[in-house]
């Protein structure tokens, strides 16, 4: 979803290079130096306004988190949250998620989160879905040997497509939930802004966890 332009967003990002990376290719293979520790790194692709990734970083200080988002306005909103918290284990990237293999070295990431990604419903848009095989190839490259993917959506069509796509790619499923908020998994679930909005309307939330 495209957000309305906020003139303050770009200057705010430029003023905070300690929290926002605008040239991630320069840190490929060096992310642990950015965090100044060797803790595992988890990346959310398409973090939106940043609620999920900020909460995850607060909840798990022993892990490092990176929120990746293309929209400058969304990064600006997420940055405001980070400026309030100043979490040492959280970094933001303002860049396109399709370049993941250019930002991270092989095996540099421990986990990937895909939350409420654009479903790109038209057939000609299939290749743009974040669970299309070319994206899965990138994920496999940058994830370590124990790395996993967590995927959440309210879109049943995208969920079913993703199950098939991952299965065809040879991935193994560690868990599949057709109504996340009605399951025991809901107790430890960290919600995104969209997730809270959809669930309040009674919309079931689909989730899967998988590895290569």
From Swiss-Prot:
<feature type="binding site">
    <location>
        <position position="118"/>
    </location>
    <ligand>
        <name>S-adenosyl-L-methionine</name>
    </ligand>
</feature>
<feature type="binding site">
    <location>
        <begin position="192"/>
        <end position="195"/>
    </location>
    <ligand>
        <name>substrate</name>
    </ligand>
</feature>
<dbReference type="InterPro" id="IPR003358">
    <property type="entry name" value="tRNA_(Gua-N-7)_MeTrfase_Trmb"/>
</dbReference>
<protein>
    <recommendedName>
        <fullName>tRNA (guanine-N(7)-)-methyltransferase</fullName>
        <ecNumber>2.1.1.33</ecNumber>
    </recommendedName>
</protein>
<keyword id="KW-0489">Methyltransferase</keyword>
<keyword id="KW-0949">S-adenosyl-L-methionine</keyword>
<dbReference type="InterPro" id="IPR029063">
    <property type="entry name" value="SAM-dependent_MTases_sf"/>
</dbReference>
<feature type="binding site">
    <location>
        <position position="44"/>
    </location>
    <ligand>
        <name>S-adenosyl-L-methionine</name>
    </ligand>
</feature>
<dbReference type="InterPro" id="IPR055361">
    <property type="entry name" value="tRNA_methyltr_TrmB_bact"/>
</dbReference>
<feature type="binding site">
    <location>
        <position position="122"/>
    </location>
    <ligand>
        <name>substrate</name>
    </ligand>
</feature>
<comment type="pathway">
    <text>tRNA modification; N(7)-methylguanine-tRNA biosynthesis.</text>
</comment>
<feature type="binding site">
    <location>
        <position position="69"/>
    </location>
    <ligand>
        <name>S-adenosyl-L-methionine</name>
    </ligand>
</feature>
<keyword id="KW-0819">tRNA processing</keyword>
<keyword id="KW-0808">Transferase</keyword>
<dbReference type="GO" id="GO:0043527">
    <property type="term" value="C:tRNA methyltransferase complex"/>
</dbReference>
<comment type="function">
    <text>Catalyzes the formation of N(7)-methylguanine at position 46 (m7G46) in tRNA.</text>
</comment>
<comment type="similarity">
    <text>Belongs to the class I-like SAM-binding methyltransferase superfamily. TrmB family.</text>
</comment>
<feature type="binding site">
    <location>
        <position position="154"/>
    </location>
    <ligand>
        <name>substrate</name>
    </ligand>
</feature>
<feature type="active site">
    <location>
        <position position="118"/>
    </location>
</feature>
<dbReference type="GO" id="GO:0008176">
    <property type="term" value="F:tRNA (guanine(46)-N7)-methyltransferase activity"/>
</dbReference>
<feature type="binding site">
    <location>
        <position position="96"/>
    </location>
    <ligand>
        <name>S-adenosyl-L-methionine</name>
    </ligand>
</feature>
<dbReference type="Pfam" id="PF02390">
    <property type="entry name" value="Methyltransf_4"/>
</dbReference>
